[in-house]
Amino acid sequence: MSDLDAVLARVDADLDASLERLFALLRIPSVSTDPAFADQCVACADHLAADLKSIGFDAARRDTIGHPMVVAHGGPKPGSGAGPHVLFYGHYDVQPPDPLEKWESGPFEPRIVETPAGKRIVARGSSDDKGQLMTFVEACRAWKKVA
């Protein structure tokens, strides 16, 4: 089995735990355009930094004049030599969920729904951009476990 096959198998095996981590992130109402949610943006950045640290990255929240960002670095395994460099970018902030009456459930209470096209996750930020961001984190988590 190639390293890539092993990583993909690990991603599949860890799907339920990965979804729980994504749902925890989606529950944080990190609305960047509303000053009332500034503390939630900080909480979301701290959450991401802690998650990245849990898989071996040197990660930290960096405060800015606006909302904080998260920077993480991780080197190759000791003794493995120099590895490839990977950079990913995403954002943890979301747009306001208004109008609330358009939501069938709370915008920060993620759920999986069946559609004619298959299952999908419904929550503010699930596709822009917390879902994409967590695909990067989960891929790194799987790679670090098996490669």
Regions found by a protein language model. Give the residues of each.
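N-terminal helical capping/dimerization or prosegment-like subdomains
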Residues: 2-100
